[in-house]
């Protein structure tokens, strides 16, 4: 069975003195991805002193809407400080999809052609930015510009994985540039 890696979180600041860490969750399935015993690939940021390459979840709990995770390899606050900024990846079957039909893994969206609602080509999806309010699709236009499109139903009404396309309810300034002001 072919597998791929998906980004599931980024380690934040330490919580307490026993090595618990806050987690910037990048998955819609945190209870599954951070279940005790789960093994994740650790990707330290450039310049990090951390030598962690794999971590095993010891425990996970919610505290005031923040996920706190303890890893077998992180025993104390000093080790937790060194782990800050590490990206965590889970291995999933290549054909896996999230349980919710309106949710997608990043790799399912990257490479899709982007069209407006009339069928005109806008470019292609080159990435996603995971933000606080909502995720953003990065759409590379034919002229080489990158546009950030909020990944919400009102602006992205259709995702057709089989057809390898997304439909964007474009408006001036979203993907297409604003019209030139003729008064200058």
Swiss-Prot record:
Gene3D superfamilies: PRC-barrel domain, RimM. GO terms for biological process: ribosomal small subunit biogenesis; rRNA processing. An accessory protein needed during the final step in the assembly of 30S ribosomal subunit, possibly for assembly of the head region. Essential for efficient processing of 16S rRNA. May be needed both before and after RbfA during the maturation of 16S rRNA. It has affinity for free ribosomal 30S subunits but not for 70S ribosomes. It is found in: Cytoplasm. HAMAP family: Ribosome_mat_RimM (MF_00014). Belongs to the RimM family. InterPro entries: PRC_barrel-like_sf (IPR011033), PRC_RimM (IPR056792), RimM (IPR011961), RimM_N (IPR002676), RimM_N_sf (IPR036976), Transl_B-barrel_sf (IPR009000). Residues 101-174 form the PRC barrel domain. Keywords: Chaperone, Cytoplasm, Ribosome biogenesis, rRNA processing. The PRC barrel domain binds ribosomal protein uS19. One of its GO terms (cellular component) is cytoplasm. GO terms for molecular function: ribosome binding. This is Ribosome maturation factor RimM. Binds ribosomal protein uS19. It comes from Nocardioides sp. (strain ATCC BAA-499 / JS614).
């Amino acid at each position: 069975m072919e597998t791929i890696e998906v980004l599931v979180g980024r380690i934040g600041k330490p919580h307490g003195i026993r090595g618990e860490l806050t987690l910037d969750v990048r998955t819609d399935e945190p209870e599954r991805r951070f279940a005790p015993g789960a093994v994740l690939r650790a990707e330290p940021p450039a310049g990090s002193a951390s030598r962690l390459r794999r971590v095993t979840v010891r425990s996970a709990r919610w505290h005031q809407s923040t996920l706190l995770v303890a890893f077998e390899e992180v025993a104390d606050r000093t080790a937790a400080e060194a782990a800050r900024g590490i990206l965590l990846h889970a291995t999933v079957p290549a054909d896996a999809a999230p349980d919710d039909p309106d949710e997608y893994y990043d790799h399912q969206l990257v490479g899709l052609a982007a069209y407006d609602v009339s069928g005109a080509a806008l470019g292609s999806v080159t990435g996603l930015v995971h933000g606080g309010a909502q995720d953003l699709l990065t759409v590379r236009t034919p002229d080489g510009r990158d546009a950030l499109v909020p990944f919400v139903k009102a602006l992205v009404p259709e995702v057709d994985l089989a057809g390898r396309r997304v439909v964007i309810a474009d408006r001036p300034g979203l993907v297409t540039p604003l019209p030139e002001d003729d008064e200058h």
